[in-house]
């Protein structure tokens, strides 16, 4: 597989074309940002940690019947992925109240949400990823009703798989965001799953073990990401 020109560079990942028009190389960089890019930093080993973390999670989800774009690791910081037509709507499931939910509704952090909540957000940094609903998504042509239903179904299936995985390792999966795309008429999980895009707490101490460590200046960001990975059985070296 020959890696060719860069197609897109996001805040923490880059996408490269390959000699196969249906395959891309996803490169995880050491760049870290928060608050729509207002806070930025380079964190050593982050690209490697998130790449291997994502590979582990994607393989678990594939084994559970969730279709993903992940095809395999190419190097410490690179993965081979299927080309998707991405849907510009993020799916968010919350098992515990935290983050924007608390700010928006004035609820305290740490409340168990039963059943877990499901929300949609438009992927748009300039607008700060506003919350939207199925009606808006269909009316503006971001996704069809049946696609949104499938995205919701898969997002909850991911929760069933990963909530138990983290719980068995002594951690709470507080919330997470997923992005989906289209491939051959199928809805497929794209982007990544890493501590950058979810909230993870220690089950006993409620220690934050995700990107909130960077957002809130708690320190030991990558060391904590690696601790999460080790608890799950991920080998980084």
Curated annotation (Swiss-Prot):
PROSITE patterns for this protein: SAICAR_SYNTHETASE_1 (PS01057), SAICAR_SYNTHETASE_2 (PS01058)
InterPro entries linked to this entry: SAICAR_synt/ADE2_N, SAICAR_synt_PurC, SAICAR_synth, SAICAR_synthetase, SAICAR_synthetase_CS
Gene3D superfamilies tied to this protein: ATP-grasp fold, B domain, Phosphorylase Kinase, domain 1
Domain of life: Bacteria
Key words of the record: ATP-binding, Ligase, Nucleotide-binding, Purine biosynthesis
Matching CDD domains: SAICAR_synt_PurC (cd01415)
Any single GO BP term: 'de novo' IMP biosynthetic process
EC category name: ligase
GO cellular component terms, A-Z: cytosol
An example molecular function term from Gene Ontology annotations: ATP binding
Entry EC number(s): 6.3.2.6
Recorded catalytic activity of this chain's protein: 5-amino-1-(5-phospho-D-ribosyl)imidazole-4-carboxylate + L-aspartate + ATP = (2S)-2-[5-amino-1-(5-phospho-beta-D-ribosyl)imidazole-4-carboxamido]succinate + ADP + phosphate + 2 H(+)
Family matches, as Pfam families: SAICAR_synt
Keyword Cell inner membrane: no
Pathway assigned in UniProt: Purine metabolism; IMP biosynthesis via de novo pathway; 5-amino-1-(5-phospho-D-ribosyl)imidazole-4-carboxamide from 5-amino-1-(5-phospho-D-ribosyl)imidazole-4-carboxylate: step 1/2
Entry's family note: Belongs to the SAICAR synthetase family.
Protein name, entry field: Phosphoribosylaminoimidazole-succinocarboxamide synthase
Species this chain originates from: Marinobacter nauticus (strain ATCC 700491 / DSM 11845 / VT8)
Lineage: Bacteria, Pseudomonadati, Pseudomonadota, Gammaproteobacteria, Pseudomonadales
The gene coding this protein: purC
């Amino acid at each position: 597989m020959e890696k060719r020109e860069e197609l897109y560079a996001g805040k923490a990942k880059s996408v490269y074309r390959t000699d196969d028009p249906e395959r891309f190389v996803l490169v995880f960089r050491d760049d870290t940002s928060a608050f729509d890019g207002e806070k930025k930093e380079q964190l050593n080993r982050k690209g490697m940690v998130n790449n291997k973390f994502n590979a582990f999670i994607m393989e678990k989800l594939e084994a559970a019947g969730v279709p993903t774009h992940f095809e395999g690791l190419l190097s410490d910081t690179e993965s081979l992925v299927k080309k998707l037509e991405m849907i510009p709507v993020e799916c968010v499931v919350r098992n515990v109240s935290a983050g924007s939910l608390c700010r928006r509704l004035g609820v305290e952090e740490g409340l168990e949400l039963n059943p877990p909540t499901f929300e949609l957000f438009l992927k748009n940094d300039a607008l700060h990823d506003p919350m939207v609903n199925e009606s808006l998504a269909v009316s503006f042509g971001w996704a069809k009703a049946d696609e949104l239903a499938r995205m919701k179904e898969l997002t909850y299936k991911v929760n069933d798989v990963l909530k138990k995985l983290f719980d068995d390792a002594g951690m709470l999966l507080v919330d997470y965001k997923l992005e989906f795309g289209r491939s051959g008429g199928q809805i497929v999980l794209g982007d990544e799953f890493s501590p950058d895009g979810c909230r993870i707490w220690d089950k006993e101490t409620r220690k934050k073990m995700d990107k909130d460590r960077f957002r809130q200046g708690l320190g030991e960001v990558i060391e904590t990401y690696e601790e999460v990975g080790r608890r799950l059985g991920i080998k980084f070296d």
